Amino acid sequence: MIRELKNMKIWKNTSTLDGYDEGLPFTSIKEEADIVLLGSKPIGLEGFSNLKGIFRVGISRDNVPIEEAETMGIIVRFPSQETIDIVYEETACFTCSLIFRMLYSEIGTLDPWWKGIRVQLNDKVLLVIGTGNIGSRVAKKMQDFLKVETYDLLQNTATELKSLIASAD
């Protein structure tokens, strides 16, 4: 089994694992690929005549041809729910940190200390770009604290983004 795995060739469309993939047998020729490491860009399965498995590097599923792959007997695997939850929690924490910086950006040192203008969180607008697995969860969590606007390529037009950015804090 190990010998068979060592002989498998990997095709990828992501740089996520660059630096961690030394010694792995990569190919840029689809016909030679046994395994695909799939990033955020969608792929079609035409040309992958030897493919045995697709492994999604990120957490989204919208760019994976699941039904087509399974019909062809190709194994499809995604990161664990634990990994998805960790990414969500980290994204929500980063968002809270940015909100804190936005509210208290005027405060520098304590010497001389002055009482800054109080800013209400519910008056602020957060723009969440991308409402997939993580973005939708962050938007839902943050709407309890402030106004949330969302933008997603699958739901909005490109022209809407500029005005949404302008209205966001």
Question: Which ranges hold each PLM region?
Answer:
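Rossmann-like dinucleotide/phosphate-binding beta-alpha-beta segment
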Residues: 1, 116-169
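N-terminal glycine-/charge-rich "phosphate-binding" loop or analogous flexible N-terminal tail
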Residues: 1-38, 138, 143-151, 156-158
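Phosphate-coordination loops involved in phosphoryl transfer and adenosine-cofactor binding
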Residues: 5-7, 51, 122-126
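Short amphipathic alpha-helical segments and helix-helix/interface helices
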Residues: 21, 45-48, 65-67, 139-140, ...
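A short, aliphatic-rich alpha-helical micro-motif
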Residues: 29-31, 48, 164-167
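Structural motif
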Residues: 34-35, 53, 125, 169
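Phosphate/diphosphate ligand-binding glycine-rich loop within oxidoreductases
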Residues: 35-107
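Short helix/loop segment immediately N-terminal to the Walker
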Residues: 108-118
